[in-house]
């Protein structure tokens, strides 16, 4: 029988050691960049903190990391970097692609900075990660191949440095001659356009008049892979409807963008068990955010007329948002919090539940989304905090809803999934 986390915690408590003290007991005064800190930085930070990417500085070399050491320590201890803001004390705690640092990794960085940021023996430095140029797709490694289809907006669009917010609608033909199921997708502004693309939402227009939502890109978001057994149908002859929000570049330069959508398909002839749906839920367009108020709560609700299995949730707020929670209200009035996450407008993060804990929600339930806002001087993004703010499309307006990824279950499928979940818990309790 393996040593569980719970058992390990009990043992540590009995002998009077914490994971942090074990760290220092094993490595007294020896934590250095080459052996201990560089692997953490390379694995978790340099995807963004490298030349030509979106971060303000590169962290590929010792000298730069040492210079920024106190700031890095502050950010990782606050868990504002790497950006992954799920509340570790509330709700579901198992996620795919969790980019947050472990407590031990944070302790290692803090101890290194506090000890003077020693370099160590550079012979032990791991090779620095190699990256393709800015037009590469981040999903190529995960999918094992380039995209099957790339669809750009029809023409480049230039955003003037002194211009207002722009909400543009574009139409792109896909050129598809047969129906296909989408496994994964990635939306990518052009390299020059990154600073001015706030969001890019695509919807499908089928030749027969149907269609629906396809994808959403926003600041800090990269790509989506549909869970196993699911996919999104795109039909032959589909036209894409783009809704792109541009804002003037903060560097005072004119910027030209040509955003593109990359699609990876399931193998021809392979149909998924379920069609994945991405939809925003519990919208609250009656926002009332008075100036000077530091903690403002809003609530939104969504009734479910079908059984669903939730695979991911992604909060959506604007500059004044600070936190969002999602809970289920069952027909018998029981309430269950699924997840809470802090909010940073620069990072639109989809939190993908691990398959074994994806919430199973019976029809007749209500999704309840609670959001909090700060319209006071303590919020650096508040602008003039004397001003009232309400719902709207501009970044200086605000919003409150959750993007929910899910698929529908028949009554039999729901009952079977619940039975499997209960059986799994019983097996786990015997370990």
Identify what each model region corresponds to.
Residues 1-11:
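Bacterial N-terminal signal peptides that target proteins for export
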């Amino acid at each position: 029988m393996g040593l569980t986390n719970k058992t390990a915690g009990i043992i540590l408590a009995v002998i009077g050691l914490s994971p942090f003290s074990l760290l220092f007991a094993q490595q007294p005064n020896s934590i250095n960049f080459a052996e201990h800190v560089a692997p953490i930085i390379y694995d978790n930070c340099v995807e963004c903190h490298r030349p030509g990417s979106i971060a303000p500085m590169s962290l590929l070399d010792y000298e730069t990391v040492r210079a920024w050491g106190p700031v890095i320590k502050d950010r990782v201890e606050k868990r504002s970097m790497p950006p992954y803001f799920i509340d570790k004390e509330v709700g579901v705690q198992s996620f795919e692609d969790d980019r947050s640092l472990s407590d031990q990794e944070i302790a290692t960085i803090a101890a290194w900075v506090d000890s003077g940021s020693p370099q160590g023996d550079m012979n032990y430095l791991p090779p620095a990660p190699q990256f393709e140029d800015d037009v590469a797709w981040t999903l190529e490694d995960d999918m094992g191949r380039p995209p099957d289809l790339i669809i750009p907006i029809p023409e480049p669009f230039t955003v003037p440095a002194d211009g207002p917010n722009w909400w543009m609608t574009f139409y792109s033909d896909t050129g598809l001659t047969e129906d296909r199921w989408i496994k994964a997708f990635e939306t990518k502004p052009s390299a020059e356009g990154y600073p001015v693309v706030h969001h890019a939402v695509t919807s499908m227009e089928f030749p027969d008049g149907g269609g629906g939502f396809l994808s959403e890109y926003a600041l800090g978001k990269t790509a989506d892979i549909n869970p196993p057994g699911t996919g999104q149908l795109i039909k032959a002859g589909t036209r894409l409807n783009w809704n792109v929000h541009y804002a003037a570049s903060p560097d005072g330069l004119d910027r030209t963008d040509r955003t593109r959508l990359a699609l990876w398909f399931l193998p021809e002839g392979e149909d998924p068990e379920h069609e994945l749906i991405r939809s925003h839920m519990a919208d609250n367009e009656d926002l009332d955010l008075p100036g000077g108020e530091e903690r403002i709560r809003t609530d939104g609700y969504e009734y479910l007329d079908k059984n669903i299995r939730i695979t991911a949730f992604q909060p959506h707020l604007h500059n004044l948002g600070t936190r969002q929670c999602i809970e289920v209200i069952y027909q018998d009035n029981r309430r269950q919090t699924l997840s809470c996450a802090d909010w940073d407008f620069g990072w639109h993060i989809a939190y993908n539940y691990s398959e074994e804990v994806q919430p199973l929600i019976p029809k007749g339930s209500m999704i309840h989304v609670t959001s909090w806002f700060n319209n006071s001087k303590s919020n650096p993004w508040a602008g003039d905090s004397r001003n009232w703010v309400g719902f709207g499309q501009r970044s200086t307006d605000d919003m409150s809803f959750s993007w929910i990824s899910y698929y529908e279950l028949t009554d039999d499928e729901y009952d079977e999934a619940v039975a499997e979940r209960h059986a799994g818990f019983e097996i786990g309790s015997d370990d």
